[in-house]
Swiss-Prot record:
This is 2,3-diketo-5-methylthiopentyl-1-phosphate enolase. Substrate binds at residues 147, 173-176, 264, 337, 359-360. The active site is at residue 98. The modification N6-carboxylysine is found at residue 173. GO terms for molecular function: 2,3-diketo-5-methylthiopentyl-1-phosphate enolase activity; magnesium ion binding; ribulose-bisphosphate carboxylase activity. It comes from Geobacillus thermodenitrificans (strain NG80-2). The gene is mtnW. Belongs to the RuBisCO large chain family. Type IV subfamily. Binds 1 Mg(2+) ion per subunit. GO terms for biological process: carbon fixation; L-methionine salvage from methylthioadenosine. Catalyzes the enolization of 2,3-diketo-5-methylthiopentyl-1-phosphate (DK-MTP-1-P) into 2-hydroxy-3-keto-5-methylthiopentenyl-1-phosphate (HK-MTPenyl-1-P).
Length: 413
């Protein structure tokens, strides 16, 4: 029998096993011991089962926080897939719908059978496809966030796009809070942006992609995305958690939207930060987004301005790139507060197949966006060569200025 196995972290004053059994029954057949034998036999294939309990013992900080003694355990429950349709909304409603309202319960993971995974598309392009588009195979990619664009016009956008591209970035993304407006209409951002980046390409031979923010009412998104594809959009930035995972999957599965999708984590912080409630970041920002079809996934880095714990951030990256999964690997994009002095940490922790993503770390450089991009490229080259930044700055003025402004964290070989 095909099942989905959900892993939870439970905190409860009472019997953890009893709590787990109540969840397994309550989210499937509702009751069991009071049913006649014939009905039990008929419903057996629909019944949830507790398949594992690992008791963790009490947590002093948790007891102090809740002002009561709580037992803790990792609990695994198997849900028969015959109970729900093969889509993410049904999966979430079953495994963590009303349960998310029921005390101190946190969803850590969902294990899907190979049969069930076939219902999901995964990334259309993934790491390999994106690398082919930019022609870069031997280093982390560099992306610039288009900051300070709200209230500006197309002339400003194209001018700043060129500067960022001339600095050597591989991608430029819209700010996630840049929406369709009279000064910067969606379609004109695409056409003007492509023209500007083509000019730089003809000048330098270096290809830069532009991720335009796909926004608007949910039921208008597909037509808008199709139009973007027709206009030659490089990448679509998408605030997936303000719309829903199934909307992302719908965009990915439409064959007329043959454009990479970059998932932004905006609003996910409402679901992930607590150790007692919500959804683990590796599941929400990792496994789910890869299943649904994101080619890139932004998430807070462990050392920036909106930091995740290091192991949580690495867990997201592992979920996006695990080669045991039957999907293309998605690009991890650790973000927020990144500057050139952090590049050695990024390379150490996330390796070659990640994207170094910066806003203020590029635009705030003393020499502007061009200098900011150059500083990052020099830092990436130094990290890959195993050189300390304090040595690399001797050969690169842009990197020296960046380190003078933001400092650096060296990673000794």
């Amino acid at each position: 029998m095909s099942t989905v196995i959900a892993t939870y972290l439970l905190h409860d004053e009472k019997d953890i096993r009893k709590k787990a059994e109540g969840i397994a029954l309550g989210l499937t057949v509702g009751t069991w011991t009071d049913l006649p034998a014939l009905e039990q036999e008929q419903l057996r294939k629909h019944k949830g089962e507790v398949v594992g309990i690992e008791e963790l013992g009490e947590s002093g900080p948790a007891n102090e926080y809740f002002d009561k003694r709580l037992k803790r355990a990792i609990v695994k429950i198997a849900y028969p897939t015959v109970n729900f349709s093969a889509d993410l909304p049904a999966l979430l409603a079953t495994t963590f719908g009303k349960l998310s309202l029921d005390g101190e319960v946190r969803l850590l993971d969902l294990e899907l059978s190979d049969e069930w995974k076939r219902h999901f598309p995964g990334p259309r392009f993934g790491i390999a496809g994106i690398r082919e588009k930019v022609g870069v195979y031997d280093r982390p990619l560099l992306m610039s966030i288009f900051k300070g664009i709200i209230g500006r016009d197309l002339a400003y956008l194209t001018s700043e796009l060129k500067k960022q591209a001339l600095g050597g970035v591989d991608l430029v993304k819209d700010d996630e809070i840049l929406f369709d407006n009279e000064l910067l209409p969606f379609e004109k951002r695409i056409t003007a942006g492509k023209a500007a980046l083509q000019e730089v390409y003809e000048q330098t031979g270096k290809r830069t992609l532009y991720a335009v923010n796909l926004t608007g009412k949910t039921f208008e998104l597909k037509e808008k995305a199709k139009r973007a594809a027709e206009l030659g959009a490089d990448v679509l930035l998408f605030n997936v958690f303000t719309y829903g995972l199934d909307v992302l999957q719908g965009l990915r599965e439409d064959e007329n939207i043959n454009v990479p999708i970059m998932a932004h984590p905006a609003f996910s912080g409402a679901m992930t930060p607590s150790e007692f409630y919500g959804v683990a970041p590796s599941l929400l920002l990792g496994k789910f987004l890869r299943l649904a079809g994101a080619d890139f996934v932004l998430f807070p880095s462990p050392y920036g301005s909106v930091a995740l714990e290091r192991e949580q951030a690495l867990g997201i990256a592992r979920a996006l790139t695990d080669e045991q999964e039957p999907f293309a690997r998605a690009f991890p994009v650790p973000s927020a507060g990144i500057h050139p002095g952090l590049v050695p940490l990024l390379v150490r922790d996330f390796g070659l197949d990640c994207i170094v993503n910066a806003g203020g770390g590029i635009h705030g450089h003393p020499d502007g966006a061009i200098g900011g991009g150059q500083a990052f490229r020099a830092a990436i080259d130094a990290a890959l060569a195993g050189r300390l930044l304090r040595e690399a700055v001797k050969e690169n003025e842009a990197l020296q200025k960046a380190i003078d402004r933001w400092g650096a964290i060296e990673v000794e070989a």
